[in-house]
A protein has these predicted regions:
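Alpha-helical scaffold segments that flank or form the walls of functional sites
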Residues: 26, 75-146, 171-186
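N-terminal metal-binding scaffold of metallo-dependent hydrolase/deaminase domains
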Residues: 1-45
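Metal-coordinating catalytic core of metallo-dependent amide/deamination hydrolases
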Residues: 132-243
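Divalent metal-coordination and catalytic microenvironments
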Residues: 7, 25, 31, 55, ...
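Flexible loop residues that form catalytic
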Residues: 12, 68, 128
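Residue-level detector of flexible, active-site-proximal loop/helix-junction positions
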Residues: 40, 57, 155
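N-terminal-biased segments
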Residues: 58-100, 163, 167, 222-233, ...
Length: 243
């Protein structure tokens, strides 16, 4: 058990913010919070050392609901470009490198460490089309004790041939990732169905992923209407779809 003392800010429920000046957080040996207190309960072992942070502020860890792990090296790069040329010029060439498991492990380790350093302990993460690299990413989150939804990306059109997977390959990879996490995970790292966006996914792929989501109950992440160029392109690709 560990005990921390500081000014504590947290939300016991989604619509309630609570502040406890110079309060205490008691954490069990398994990492779960025993309780948050204004004063320590008398039944606690007072011989345990309290880690006192003085007037510092203790808050819950951050959640990142949309992050691309293989774009870690591209942070801040060529922000003068719109999305579509940026993807083709910088992002797709970088993501292609994750076919190499050693490269994936090296960069993903840095990515996960950076999240940890910045206090982001839970994330919804895009990987790439590569099953082994995506499994490596999931395992690194498990090893770090962090929570994540990790997605094997679906792409089978309008992208480099080196960065495409068939519908069958994607579904096989998703099943293997789910089985791996069911067997080796700790419950905090889970798979998420991840079609990149409409321009890169055929109707057949999207339909199959929808069926897989209904079958498994897995959540889905993607992109929608990020800028006008993308919207216009989707209208050309899917003229029979309306919103």
């Amino acid at each position: 058990m560990k005990i921390y003392r500081a000014n504590i800010l947290y939300t016991p429920s989604p619509k309630k913010l609570e502040i406890i000046p110079h309060g205490y957080i008691v954490v069990r040996s398994n990492g779960l919070i025993e309780g948050i207190y204004k004063e320590l309960p008398e039944n606690l072992d007072w011989r345990r050392q309290v880690m006192d942070f003085g007037d510092k502020l203790l808050i819950p860890a951050f959640n990142d609901l949309h992050v691309h792990a293989p774009q870690y090296r591209n942070m801040g790069l060529a922000l003068d470009l719109e999305l579509l040329p940026w993807l083709n010029t910088y992002t797709f060439p970088e993501e292609t490198k994750y076919a190499d498991p050693d490269y994936a492990r090296r960069l993903y380790r840095r990515f996960v460490h950076e999240l940890w350093m910045q206090g982001t302990m839970r994330s919804a993460v895009f990987g790439t089309i590569h099953p082994e690299a995506t499994r490596i990413l999931a395992d690194l989150f498990i090893q770090a004790g962090m929570g994540a939804y990790v997605g094997l990306v679906g792409m089978n059109r309008n992208s480099p041939e080196t960065l495409q997977n068939t519908t069958a390959e994607l579904l096989d990879g998703m099943r293997m990732l789910k089985e791996h996490l069911d067997e080796h995970g700790d419950g905090r790292v889970k798979p998420i169905i991840t079609p990149r966006f409409v321009p890169s996914c055929s109707d057949k792929m999207l339909r199959a992923l929808g069926e897989y989501a209904a079958e498994t109950g897995l959540p889905v992440q993607s992109h929608l209407s990020e800028n006008r160029s993308e919207i216009d392109w989707v209208k050309e690709l899917e003229p029979d779809s309306t919103c």
